[in-house]
Amino acid sequence: MRYLPEVDPEIYEAIKSEEYREEYHLELIASENFVSRAVLEAQGSVLTNKYAEGYPGKRYYGGCMYVDKVEDIARERVKTIYGAEHANVQPHSGSQANMAVYFVVLNPGDNVLGMNLAHGGHLTHGSPVNFSGKLYNFYFYGVDRDTEMINYDSVWNLAKEVKPKLIVAGASAYPRIIDFEKFAQIAEDVGAYFMVDMAHIAGLVAAGLHPSPVPYAHFVTSTTHKTLRGPRGGFILCKKEFAKEIDKAVFPGIQGGPLMHVIAAKAVAFKEAMTPEFKEYQKQIILNAKAMAEELMRLGYRLVSGGTDNHLMLVDLRDKGITGKEAEKALEEAGITVNKNAIPFDPQPPTVTSGIRIGTPALTTRGMKEDEMRYVARLIHEVLSNFKDSKVKEKVKKEVEELCKQFPIYRKEN
């Protein structure tokens, strides 16, 4: 950085501190990842200067010929990746992508069926503290108490009972494959629209490692970070029949000018997602998750649903004498970043929780493989077994730093 240290040393120091934290801590938050240098360059470009309300060829400002090209490239790439009929790449976030879909098909007070946040859903799938729960009448499906997986017969019965106008599938903490075809059948049976929020699994879907929702859903929303390894932002895929309505819902419905520097970074990430290397990377994310899950279970931890099919796992800590909140804090003190997370039927409040959520995308980006995952699982076990012992946490922190040195975030090939 050439100018920032002199212009704003406080912000410069905060950024350098975050760089150090990312480089010398183990990032296991399932929704976080490290973008490529190319994505960073695009997002830090002069495109941040340009206002471009509207869409390519139909802007409300002049001088948009180059940002038009950027947005067209981003739209075409994401359509190609997922085989979609229409794409909108302007949503600033996954939440705004979801809001746009709701604005297209729902009126305030309409019935909607979504996944219970406490069972792995998302705030924007009807939580009462979120706009979705305030504007619409959400009913919730969850997981089976015994299998801790979605019971599609129960979803079907609930849908027939509440007759939702929209069914939402997708999750923020569900470690198993979601059967989008079954959800689509349920939606068709009750005459509902069907939307999938694939934010967490977008990279896996792009690589063909999780069934795609695109053939089955009227609308598919996603973030561009997480497994897709792009900048923080969102996008919407839909059938052509909804294209005009979706575009109007995003602009002028809920947003003004698009963030063209972020859309450029999205385009770069989409190009990266079209490579054979990206598919191998996604395969490794899953292999790493399975290796870590197996090692944690070998060490005596109970995982929700007994394992994982994707990039994340939920660890139930109820029999370990430690809450999710305490575990998150202890691990952070040892240089390992996870997040406290509710488990299904959790007796603890959401600010405390009985579990932690662990994901492997960021460590996989660093080049770590199965052996490192098993080692990290043992480090987690060492901390959680001695979570009040500062000497143990300091020892593990040094081991974490040594491991991180072997796998720098921005190697030459990144």
Swiss-Prot record:
PTM annotation (N6-(pyridoxal phosphate)lysine): residues: 226
CC annotations in GO: cytosol
Residues annotated for (6S)-5,6,7,8-tetrahydrofolate binding in this entry: 117, 121-123
Pathway connected to this protein: One-carbon metabolism; tetrahydrofolate interconversion; Amino-acid biosynthesis; glycine biosynthesis; glycine from L-serine: step 1/1
Entry EC no(s): 2.1.2.1
InterPro entries named among the record's database cross-references: PyrdxlP-dep_Trfase (IPR015424), PyrdxlP-dep_Trfase_major (IPR015421), PyrdxlP-dep_Trfase_small (IPR015422), Ser_HO-MeTrfase (IPR001085), Ser_HO-MeTrfase-like (IPR049943), Ser_HO-MeTrfase_PLP_BS (IPR019798), SHMT-like_dom (IPR039429)
Keyword presence, Coiled coil: no
Primary localization class, coarse: cytoplasm
Catalytic activity of the protein: (6R)-5,10-methylene-5,6,7,8-tetrahydrofolate + glycine + H2O = (6S)-5,6,7,8-tetrahydrofolate + L-serine
Assembly, per entry: Homodimer.
Role noted for this protein: Catalyzes the reversible interconversion of serine and glycine with tetrahydrofolate (THF) serving as the one-carbon carrier. This reaction serves as the major source of one-carbon groups required for the biosynthesis of purines, thymidylate, methionine, and other important biomolecules. Also exhibits THF-independent aldolase activity toward beta-hydroxyamino acids, producing glycine and aldehydes, via a retro-aldol mechanism.
Family per similarity comment: Belongs to the SHMT family.
Name the record gives this protein: Serine hydroxymethyltransferase
Biological source species: Dictyoglomus thermophilum (strain ATCC 35947 / DSM 3960 / H-6-12)
Gene designation per UniProt: glyA
